Design a protein with these regions (language model features):
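Beta1/beta-strand and adjacent pyrophosphate-binding region of the FAD-binding site
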Residues: 1-12, 28
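Extreme N-terminal leader/targeting segments of oxidoreductases
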Residues: 1-4, 19-23
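Short beta-strand/turn micro-motifs composed of small residues
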Residues: 8, 31, 96-97
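Glycine-rich FAD pyrophosphate-binding loop
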Residues: 21-41
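Short, flexible, mixed-charge acidic loops at enzyme active sites
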Residues: 39-45, 132-136
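Dinucleotide-binding Rossmann-like beta1-alpha1 core, especially the glycine-rich loop
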Residues: 45-129
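Helical element adjacent to the flavin cofactor pocket in flavoenzyme catalytic cores
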Residues: 144-159
C-alpha cells in the first residue's frame, strides 16, 4: 500500500514524490501521459528563476537552483551514474511599463529580504547594460547575474 498518491507527474508532482521518498514514504504518481510525450512540463522551456513577487516563490526558486547544481550527486544511480540537468545559466531580464512599475518596486523589497541578488535598472538606463534591447515604454527592469537563473532539460526529471 502506498503512503502517498500524487495526481500529476509534472515538476511539482515529481519533486514532491522525490522528497517524500527520501523521507522513507512509499509514493505513487498517477500521470495521464506516462510517456510524457504530451505532458506540459517536459514540453516547457524548463526555466528556473527567482524573480517573483511572493517571498515563498523567490525562496523556492533559490532552492531549485541549488538542487539543480547538486543533481550529479543526488540523482546518480547504477543505471545513470552521471545525471545532468543540462543547465544553461543565462539570467533573466524582466521589463515593466509604468502600469506595473510600482508593483515591481514592492516585489524588489521581497527580493532584498530573500537575498535574491536581483538588480534594478531604470528603463532610461537599460540600453547601457543591454544595448540590444529596445527600452521604449519601459519604466523599470530587473535582472540577475547569469549564474542564478536560466533553464534546464525538463525531460531529465522524468528519466
Amino acid at each position: 500500500m502506498d503512503d502517498v498518491v500524487i495526481i500529476g507527474g509534472g515538476i511539482i508532482g515529481v519533486a514532491t514524490a522525490y522528497f517524500l521518498s527520501k523521507e522513507g514514504r512509499k509514493v505513487k504518481i498517477i500521470e495521464r501521459d506516462p510517456t510524457y510525450k504530451t505532458a506540459s512540463f517536459p514540453l516547457s522551456l524548463g526555466g528556473f528563476r527567482r524573480q517573483f513577487f511572493q517571498k515563498e516563490n523567490i525562496l523556492l526558486g533559490k532552492f531549485a537552483r541549488e538542487f539543480i547544481y547538486q543533481i550529479p550527486e543526488l540523482l546518480k544511480t547504477e543505471k545513470n551514474p552521471k545525471p545532468t540537468a543540462s543547465m544553461v545559466t543565462n539570467g533573466y531580464l524582466l521589463m515593466f511599463g509604468k502600469e506595473h512599475a510600482e508593483e515591481q518596486y514592492r516585489a524588489l523589497e521581497n527580493h532584498k529580504e530573500c537575498d535574491a541578488g536581483t538588480k534594478n535598472i531604470k528603463g532610461s538606463e537599460l540600453s547601457k547594460v543591454f544595448p540590444y534591447v529596445n527600452s521604449a515604454g519601459i519604466e523599470t527592469a530587473t535582472y540577475t547575474d547569469n549564474q542564478s537563473e536560466g533553464w534546464i532539460d525538463p525531460f531529465m526529471f522524468h528519466s
